[in-house]
Amino acid sequence: MAIEVHGVCPYFEVYDMPNSIRFYRDHLGFEIVSTSPHRGGDKDRFHWCWLRLGTAEIMLNTAYEIDEERPPLENYLRERKHRDTCLYFGCPDVDGAYAELVAKGVVVDRPPTVAPYGMKQMYLHDPDGFGLCFQWKAV
């Protein structure tokens, strides 16, 4: 018997939850599906959230559960350890996604380019340095 699976939902630990929420929700268009209880007055301050864009899902969790434990600056070594992590999103209109992201001020590391294996791909990083690629088979 094969195990029935209906998707995968990667889990990322983030340095600054409100900043990550603004990036994924306001720039990329993800919707918030669920969160842990809100903390303080900021509606984007919580420890954990589940996000969805189309059929793609991700979960974010704060790397520091207690604000006082969070260093004033992002730990470069922590970010460097996941520099090789990249999520690949199926995106039929890579050029349109690129234009929309650039219009919103998002820094794109590599604009849409056709790779030698026939995929049109655009690469960027989220605020914590996790790689994101929007891709589709080139025509």
Annotated model-derived regions:
Residues 1-3, 47, 89, 98-139:
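Vicinal oxygen chelate
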